[in-house]
Amino acid sequence: METEKEDRKTDRIEKEENKRIRKDKNEGIRKDKNESLEKEKKNGAVNRSVTAVILMAGSGKRMHTEEKKQFLPLCGKPLFCASVERFISWLRCEELLLVVGAEDKETVEGYVQQEGWRKEKKISIVEGGAERFDSVAAALHFIEEKGNPENYVFIHDAARPFFTEDLLERLYKELQYSKAVIPGIPVKDTIKVERDGIVEKSLDRKTLYAVQTPQVFDFQVLSRAFKSFLPRREEWKDKITDDAMIVEEFSKERIRLIAGEEENIKITVKEDLRFLKEKHKNFFPF
């Protein structure tokens, strides 16, 4: 019995020590990046910060669990924490908006306070809507009223926890060439167009990409597109599946596509999370 207690105590001490080492390492990396960022600003290379909009108002029906997928456990924390902490650690990000269902506002606020995130970034909780575009529209309204409309907007699905800071940096730097940038990966499977159980044609997969998030925009471009879209919401609601589509259809802005990340998948079923947790045991700093 005493031996078991000692073993548990030793394990706890080792975990705390490893956590401290990771924290010290991350703080060192952050200091180096901060110095590099300051140099960029002095050279005029950087003049706009980022507002991250993390969408987590969905019900996650395909998971077939009582608990919403954004709250499923990942490395001892709810799934959405991974995305929040990735943006918090990214120095270009100035503020985060967590867009949640009305019934989850209190729960998410509890996690924000528990983790002490507001010590590092400005964080606001915004009530989302029934559809994805309703949630994004709520975030844009908040930014226009209380946030910083001069910032770039990075819209990200909380159900995509396995994205890297390298992707964020590449998206940010691409904004010097375009006011709308999205990541994607080439489609590997052959895609067929079907009608009533009959294949009509095959699509050229060399031109097809599976699009991911974060999708990033100049705030004014995205805001204007949404203001044009919302009056026609009912007409378009079954066709719109991401933010870029609204910019495609309701603005003249051309959207730039860059290479995404293979592991940046959207968790839609339990098996996705189980597989990725095992494959990336050391991906998260917690």
What annotation goes with each model-predicted range?
Residues 1-47:
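Intrinsically disordered, low-complexity terminal tails and inter-domain linkers enriched
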Residues 2, 210-286:
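Conserved alpha/beta core of the MobA/IspD/sugar-nucleotide pyrophosphorylase nucleotidyltransferase superfamily
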Residues 47-106:
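N-terminal glycine-rich phosphate-binding loop and ensuing alpha1 helix
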Residues 54, 80, 139, 157, ...:
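Residue-level signal for inorganic ion chemistry
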Residues 91-92, 114-122, 146-147:
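Short helix-capping segments at alpha-helix termini
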Residues 106-112:
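Acidic helix N-cap motif at the loop->helix transition within catalytic regions
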Residues 122, 130-194, 212:
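Conserved beta-loop-beta/alpha segment of the NTase-like Rossmann-fold superfamily
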Residues 193-217:
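Short, flexible, basic/aromatic active-site loop/helix in glycosyltransferases
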